[in-house]
Amino acid sequence: MSETTISKEEVAHVAKLAKLSFDDSELTQFTTQLGDILNIFNTLGEVDTAAVEPTYSVTENVNHLRDDVAHNWHQKQGLLENAPLASAGLIKVPAILEDEGE
């Protein structure tokens, strides 16, 4: 089994994409932990599953929920009147992401 390594720079890049910030000690800790996790996946990849039938569920449960059918609600105006901000028939919400060109 070859050991998978991940660099602090890669962890910092993923953290930036996820809008997270870590100090140097946290980056070191997460780099070690993520490397360990990747190595666990390498170990799992070595398991011989050729004789195992693929499944999507380990139980034979049947979905007993109702059909997902769209219905016309006819109360849009009331909803918009109760929304804090509305424009052009839509509810306006504050932006949560900054455009950084990525």
From Swiss-Prot:
GO terms for molecular function: asparaginyl-tRNA synthase (glutamine-hydrolyzing) activity; ATP binding; glutaminyl-tRNA synthase (glutamine-hydrolyzing) activity. It is an enzyme of class 6 (ligase). Pfam families: GatC. Keywords: ATP-binding, Ligase, Nucleotide-binding, Protein biosynthesis. InterPro entries: Asp/Glu-ADT_sf_sub_c, GatC. One of its GO terms (biological process) is translation. Its EC number is 6.3.5.-. Allows the formation of correctly charged Asn-tRNA(Asn) or Gln-tRNA(Gln) through the transamidation of misacylated Asp-tRNA(Asn) or Glu-tRNA(Gln) in organisms which lack either or both of asparaginyl-tRNA or glutaminyl-tRNA synthetases. The reaction takes place in the presence of glutamine and ATP through an activated phospho-Asp-tRNA(Asn) or phospho-Glu-tRNA(Gln). This is Aspartyl/glutamyl-tRNA(Asn/Gln) amidotransferase subunit C. The lineage of its organism: Bacteria, Bacillati, Bacillota, Bacilli, Lactobacillales.
